[in-house]
């Protein structure tokens, strides 16, 4: 299971800066002003050979009022959700009463905790960090999150014991990047056969009360999951095995993600992490959206996490019955406007309560899974790559044309295509998007994103200085003397 790392600490110690560096985004607000992170932020990270979910929290300083009190509650809830806690402090400001209070709470929770002294750049770090040993949480790790110093080593140190205990194996190349293996034809065929024989793990996700449990009950034909007309009645992810027409499934019913103003943390403090872990554990994700409420920011957040995880996707617009045509037209227009960038995913309009359109979901779910796990040979991938070059040549880089040599499968679910060539790291994003769409159209991939990885081929001329022949040197001297004569 993918580990969860929570960043906890008082305001303005650098939690959001570290979050952005780990997730390589700017999802959390970052400015030198306390209290900007109003809520937990969730991101997917890969560093030091480990994949993990990172949770950025609002700060705690012991003087909270109003919204700050809620921020403190969110931070405490994040501690409960986490497998590993990074307790962040400010080495420049020194230890405060809030640090002591947080440390006392962490000791009482018996969580795997690492004390991180941030902002050690430009100061005598050893002297500044000495007082944090008195927090009683073990060794103090020095870091400068804004510059990235110490971040990789910290994650490596924090997650290695967890990975060893859970049997997680990491693979890194010499540059510390995740390894994409090159499958032989026999290995690719064996991997596809293995995946085809496994049950399809289907995570049904969405906000509370959009009809996820009703949809599962409709699929199963019985009241297997308790349903009340109250958001959040499903408090934990439930795994339900089933079969249909000879195909095995495992349905994952998740607790919904609700707006924080409506969260009862006692009831649903695990819901977000359970949902995100279910996405990581699934083969296909069915995102359920309420037609009456339209597309909310929470829907887009779940959609973004699903795409970042590389999971196959089907979208169900629920509660489609009983709304007039004008509302239906407005919803379809909003879907085109806000979800047009995921044109590979099938969208279904259903009524989980009455069963309308539910039967058609299976076809799209199986189609998405088959696309995500389909074997494509190296020769076919290389041929498609060459066709894309013939139709639209790669751009020039420093006066030289980018050369793509060959492509092979680097993984399944999601399908990964690894492309080898010269100067491929310098390809603009626009050309990479063109190639990704070209592969999707050529291979008829539906319901799953395709990931392209580019590997640089060794350049045998790199580092060599060009040495002129005797004749070239003579002609160069004549040309230079001619230029000097003209300038006199």
UniProtKB/Swiss-Prot annotation:
Function as written in the Swiss-Prot or TrEMBL entry: GTPase that plays an essential role in the late steps of ribosome biogenesis.
Stated name of the protein: GTPase Der
Disulfides per UniProt: none
Gene Ontology biological-process entries: ribosome biogenesis
PANTHER family documented for this protein: GTPASE DER
The keyword Repeat appears for this protein: yes
Gene: der
InterPro entries for this protein: G_ENGA (IPR031166), GTP-bd (IPR006073), GTPase_Der (IPR016484), KH_dom-like (IPR032859), KH_dom-like_a/b (IPR015946), P-loop_NTPase (IPR027417), Small_GTP-bd (IPR005225)
SUPFAM superfamilies (UniProt xref): P-loop containing nucleoside triphosphate hydrolases
Domain KH-like: residue ranges: 374-458
One MF term in the entry's GO annotations: GTP binding
Domain of life: Bacteria
Sequence positions that bind GTP 1: 9-16, 56-60, 118-121
Subunit structure: Associates with the 50S ribosomal subunit.
Domain EngA-type G: 3-166, 200-373
Pfam families named in the record: KH_dom-like, MMR_HSR1
Binding annotation for GTP 2: 206-213, 253-257, 318-321
Family named by the database record: Belongs to the TRAFAC class TrmE-Era-EngA-EngB-Septin-like GTPase superfamily. EngA (Der) GTPase family.
NCBIfam families on file: GTPase_EngA (TIGR03594), small_GTP (TIGR00231)
Species: Shewanella frigidimarina (strain NCIMB 400)
This protein's record includes keyword GTP-binding: yes
Keywords assigned: GTP-binding, Nucleotide-binding, Repeat, Ribosome biogenesis
